[in-house]
Amino acid sequence: FSCIAGDCKDSCCLGWEIDIDEDSYEYYQTLPGEVGERLRKGMYETEDGGHGIRTNNCGRCIMLNDKNLCDLYIAAGEASLSEVCTDFPRFGIEYRNVEQKCLSLACEEVCRIFFSKTKPVKFVEQELFGDSDDDQGVTEEEAAFFEEVQRELIAILQDRTKPIGVRVDEYLDRANEYQKKLSQNDVEKHIDWISFNDFSFEHFDIRFGIINEMELLRQVWQDYMASGDYRENDIEQLLVYFTFRYIMNAIYDSNIMVYAYLSVMFTMIVRDMNATRFYKNGGSFTIEDQMEVARIFSKEVEHSEENVEAAKEEIIWG
C-alpha cells in the first residue's frame, strides 16, 4: 500500500475528527514558521482532555491545501505527522508480544487493491526484534486458542469448493463450538455466556436483512444476486476482512459469537447496499461501485465506535 495523496477522491483529511497525540502536540508547540503558527491556531482541546486539529466549514483539515496535499507534510516531512495521520489506514490489535495489523476499507486505495484481487486473502507473519509490551493480562495459552479460532474460521470462509451460504453456516457453527469450549473453561477466563440458538444463514438473513420484508427491495436483491455483476468472491473477501478485524477482540471479552455474528452482519449490510446501488444504476454494478460502497460503509460504521457498539448490542439483545 502507498498513499495516493492528492489523487485521492475522498481524502482522509476531509470529514474526520483529527486527534493529536501528546508527543506530536508538544512538537507542534515548537514548530517554526507560518505552518507552525497556523497549526497552533488550529489546535483545540477535546472533551476528554486531549487535543485535535480543527476543520473548516467544509470539513477539511486546516492543513489541507487546494491540491489536497498536507502543508504540514510538505513543510516538515512525514515524521511531523501525528500518530492518527501516520497510521491511517492501518489499524491493529496488540496482545502479548503480537501485533496484528490490517488496512482499512475506509481508504479508497485500499479498496482498489482489495477488490482487484481474486485469490483468497493471505496473511504475512514477520518477526521483529526489540522490547515488547507486557502480556496485557493474556496468557500464552489464551493467545494460542484465539489465534486458532481466527485461523480456523478464515479457513472455512476461504473454502471455495462450497457455496458462500454453506460456508457461512459452517463458520457460525464452528464459532459456536469454540464459544462452548470457552465456556467450559478449556481456556481459563471468566466470561458472560451469551446463548445463541439459531445459526442458519437463512434465519440470520431474515433477522438482520430488513429487505426481506420489503417487496420492492427483495426483488432488487434477487435481481442483483442473479446478475453477472454479483461476485461471490467479494462477499468472501469481506467476510474474511471483518473476521480478521474483529474476532481477536474476543481475547479481551471472550465473546467469539458476537464478533462472528458482527462479521456476517456487516458483510450482509454491504451486500444489501450493493443491491441498492445496482437498482439505482439501472441494473449494473461495477467493481468501482463495490469499492465505493465498501468505503462508505467502513467510514460511516467501522470507524464509529458508537455504531459498532450499537451493532453489538443488537446482536446481544436483538
Kindly label every feature range from the protein language model.
Residues 6, 11, 15-16, 64, ...:
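General secretory precursor processing signal
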Residues 1-7, 120-125, 238-243:
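Short, compositionally biased low-complexity segments
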